[in-house]
Every structure is written in structure tokens, then in C-alpha cells.
């Protein structure tokens, strides 16, 4: 098989897409002989892996592929993969006829079958996940990303993911454990378990086996010798039961950083979003986790200006932010998406200037908290896993609760856990000195 064909991949969107891009790379390397290049002009095949959660990445898709078409060498092919591919399908080729094929987010393993078929569109979502093929490509030597499920069964009214990735199906636990074990044998010391709603894992399998739980999966994965740290994203607040929280708190291998997507602090807005929980439920779960895990970092997603959101609703969101004291917030202004239930609320959509101001107010509130909290870490000694060496001679790594830390060091520290005394901070990272 020829090995001189070159592949260029551009990834838009979430961490699931990053893993999907690794899967694409591995499939095409294994079955079609492609090698990856960072130079688009050298590529024989150009793929853009897309996101459709918000409007901006969709607009960016057509801008990007237009530029790719201008830059590509003669005879090079262009493919579109991911959530926008699932959503728009054939319309992508109609709008951009120079696109050679389209492969949906649930069809990555079929990339090898369509890459040579001009005009191919593969967007079905009825795959059997009991035969799921994990990616063998790795972008980080010391951290592995492993999908534990595909799709989503939630019906959040603002979200397009269920229609692009299909129903939620869990990958069999023995396959996940074996994949993590292989990754550890190849040098990984940390694993990131990925799914749209990881803590609803085990409710449905392709082979109709008995139900399982995410807590049990965490216990099974943590038994793997050589694995030092387990992370996961994203959990759903609705499924954060006491059993899960207690396992999270007591299991020393689980990273003490958790993503809890709030979306809104208003119970009435949460109901309109069909999130399934109330403001009080969210605060109760966050409080219980803070109580059991003193050094816990909590990150979140928040949407402002959802249709019908009043000023009182928005103040409820600010109240939750003040009570929980999130360590990182991914803030978004509501973006209407085609095919979502929230489109029926068009008459309740807020003026753009109101949404923009609320976004500013939220960002400013959180900024003030970080400016107060981060300097308190100066003088602390933190243990980090060193993952990379920067051109300026600094190593970069992460603490157990996923704080990014920089320190002077060498490649001898790569893949090792070291102690760093913090000497300086920003709102998002720390700097220090390696100590014995």
C-alpha cells in the first residue's frame, strides 16, 4: 500500500470532535496509506471535521472549505465530516460542489469506504456500537481519550446534537477497559473518558445486555495498573446521584475537576430548555461535591438570553455563579439552531443588545472571582503531570484538579509527576518552580 499520500485535517468544535479526527487519521492511515501533514498545499486529501452546536462554526465551515479549495493542489480531494455533515448532508455538496464526500459524526469508521467515492454522502445513525473501533492515533503521549458512548438521548430544546449524533448507545465496558489498558501499555498515564452524557453510561447497549453504571465503569477502569489519573466529560447534572458523587470523592485516581453544565440558573428557563433539573437541584449537587472534595474545581457552560429569559431569570444565573464559584465558565449567547424545539420560541427571542450585555455582565462577575481566588495559590506547592516542553524552555502540565502550570524544566520531566511551587498566576494558569 502506498504511504506517500498526505492527509490534512482541520477540526472545529468540541473534544469529541478532536477524538473523531484522531479516529479519521487512524482509519485512513491503516486502510488507505495516508500520512498526516500540517501543510494544506501538500495534501492529497483535505478533511474538515465540523461542529453545528452554534451558528458560527457552521458559517466558518463554508468559509474554510472555500479557502481550502483555493489553496489545494491539483487533484486533491476535499471531505466534510462531523455534526454539520450529519445535519446538512447532501446540501453541503449542493452549496459547495467541489466537496468530494460527506461523512456524518456517527459514521467516522466508514471513512475508508467513501473517501474514493465522488459525491458520497454517508450520514446514517444506526450503527452497532458492540463492534465500535477505537482510534489508534494519539496527539498526547501521556493522555489517552477514549469514547465510552455515542449519541445523546436528551432533548434539550436548544441543542442539535441528538439529530446529528443519534440516540445514545454505550460502548461495552470490556471494550473500554481493554482500550484504556492498551493506551497505558503505550505510555499513557491519564485517560479522558468521553461522551455527550458520560454519567448516563450503561443504560442502553447495541447488544441489549443488562444495564450498567458509569460509577461501575470508573471502578473498573481505576483497577488498571499504571493508570494514574482518570478524567471525563461531560457529565449531566441530572445524573449526579449520591453513588456517583461518593465514588468521585473517594477514588484517588479520579481527577478532582468536574464539568457541571448549568446552562441557566433559572428553574423556569431550565424547564423551557428541558434540562430536567432545577436551580435547587444543581446547587444541592454542587454543594455536596464541594463538601466531600475540598480542592474541587468546577467548570460549567452557561447560555444567556435564551428565548423568554427575563432579567429576574438572568439574576438567578448570576446567583448560582456567586454561590458555586465556578473555576471556569464557557459562556455563550443563545444561538437558534435549525431543527431544535427552541425555534418555536422565536417570538420570545431577546434583542441582540440584551444578550450581549448579559454576556458581558456574566463574564465580568466571573472575572472578579478569579482575580480574587487565583492569587491565593501563590506559595502553594502543587503536584503536576508534565505533558509538554515549550520552545522557551518551560514545561507545561496539569494538577489533579486540572490547573495548568508552567515551570522551567527539561524533557527529562515529560510524563512524570513533579512538585511545583507557585510563584505567579493569571486568571487561567499558574507559573512556578520545580521543587523536590
Curated annotation (Swiss-Prot):
The gene is miaB. Its cofactor is [4Fe-4S] cluster. Its EC number is 2.8.4.3. It holds the Pfam family Radical_SAM. It is an enzyme of class 2 (transferase). GO terms for molecular function: 4 iron, 4 sulfur cluster binding; metal ion binding; N6-isopentenyladenosine methylthiotransferase activity. Monomer. This is tRNA-2-methylthio-N(6)-dimethylallyladenosine synthase. The lineage of its organism: Bacteria, Pseudomonadati, Campylobacterota, Epsilonproteobacteria, Campylobacterales. Its main location: cytoplasm. Residues 5-120 form the MTTase N-terminal domain. It is found in: Cytoplasm. [4Fe-4S] cluster 2 binds at residues 152, 156, 159. [4Fe-4S] cluster 1 binds at residues 14, 51, 83. Residues 375-436 form the TRAM domain. Residues 138-372 form the Radical SAM core domain. Belongs to the methylthiotransferase family. MiaB subfamily.
Amino acid at each position: 500500500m502506498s504511504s506517500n499520500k498526505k492527509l490534512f485535517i482541520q477540526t472545529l468544535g468540541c473534544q469529541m470532535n478532536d477524538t473523531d479526527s484522531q479516529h479519521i487519521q487512524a482509519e485512513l492511515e491503516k486502510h488507505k496509506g495516508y500520512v498526516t501533514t500540517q501543510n494544506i498545499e501538500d495534501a492529497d486529501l483535505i478533511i474538515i471535521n465540523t461542529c453545528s452546536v452554534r451558528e458560527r462554526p457552521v458559517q466558518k465551515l463554508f468559509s474554510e472549505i472555500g479557502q481550502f479549495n483555493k489553496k489545494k493542489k491539483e487533484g486533491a480531494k476535499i471531505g466534510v465530516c462531523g455534526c454539520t455533515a450529519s445535519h446538512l448532508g447532501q446540501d453541503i455538496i449542493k452549496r459547495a460542489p467541489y466537496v468530494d464526500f460527506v461523512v456524518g459524526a456517527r459514521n467516522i469508521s466508514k471513512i475508508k469506504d467513501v473517501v474514493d467515492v465522488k459525491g458520497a454522502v454517508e450520514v446514517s445513525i444506526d450503527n452497532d456500537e458492540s463492534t465500535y473501533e477505537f482510534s489508534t492515533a494519539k496527539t498526547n503521549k501521556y493522555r489517552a481519550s477514549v469514547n465510552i458512548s455515542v449519541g445523546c438521548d436528551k432533548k434539550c430544546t436548544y441543542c442539535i446534537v441528538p439529530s446529528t449524533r443519534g440516540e445514545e448507545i454505550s460502548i461495552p465496558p470490556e471494550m473500554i477497559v481493554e482500550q484504556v489498558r492498551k493506551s497505558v501499555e503505550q505510555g499513557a498515564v491519564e485517560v479522558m473518558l468521553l461522551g455527550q452524557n458520560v454519567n448516563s453510561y450503561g443504560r442502553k447497549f447495541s447488544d441489549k445486555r443488562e444495564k450498567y453504571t458509569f460509577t461501575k465503569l470508573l471502578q473498573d477502569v481505576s483497577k488498571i495498573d499504571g493508570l494514574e489519573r482518570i478524567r471525563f466529560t461531560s457529565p449531566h447534572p441530572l445524573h449526579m446521584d449520591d453513588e456517583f458523587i461518593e465514588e468521585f470523592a473517594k477514588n484517588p485516581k479520579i481527577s478532582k475537576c468536574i464539568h457541571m453544565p448549568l446552562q441557566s440558573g433559572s428553574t423556569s428557563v431550565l424547564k423551557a430548555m428541558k434540562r430536567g433539573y432545577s436551580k435547587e437541584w444543581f446547587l444541592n449537587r454542587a454543594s455536596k461535591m464541594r463538601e466531600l472534595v475540598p480542592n474541587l474545581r468546577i467548570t460549567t457552560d452557561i447560555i444567556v438570553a435564551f428565548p423568554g429569559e427575563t432579567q429576574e431569570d438572568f439574576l438567578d444565573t448570576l446567583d448560582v455563579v456567586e454561590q458555586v464559584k465556578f473555576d471556569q465558565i464557557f459562556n455563550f449567547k443563545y444561538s437558534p439552531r435549525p431543527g431544535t424545539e427552541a425555534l418555536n420560541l422565536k417570538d420570545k427571542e431577546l434583542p441582540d443588545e440584551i444578550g450581549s450585555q448579559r454576556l458581558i455582565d456574566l463574564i465580568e462577575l466571573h472575572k472578579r472571582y478569579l482575580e480574587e481566588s487565583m492569587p491565593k495559590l501563590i506559595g502553594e506547592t502543587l503536584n503536576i503531570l508534565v505533558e509538554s516542553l515549550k520552545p522557551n524552555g518551560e514545561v507545561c502540565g496539569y494538577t489533579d484538579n486540572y490547573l495548568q502550570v508552567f515551570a522551567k524544566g527539561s524533557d527529562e520531566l515529560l510524563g512524570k509527576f513533579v512538585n511545583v511551587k507557585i510563584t505567579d498566576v493569571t486568571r487561567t494558569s499558574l507559573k512556578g518552580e520545580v521543587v523536590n
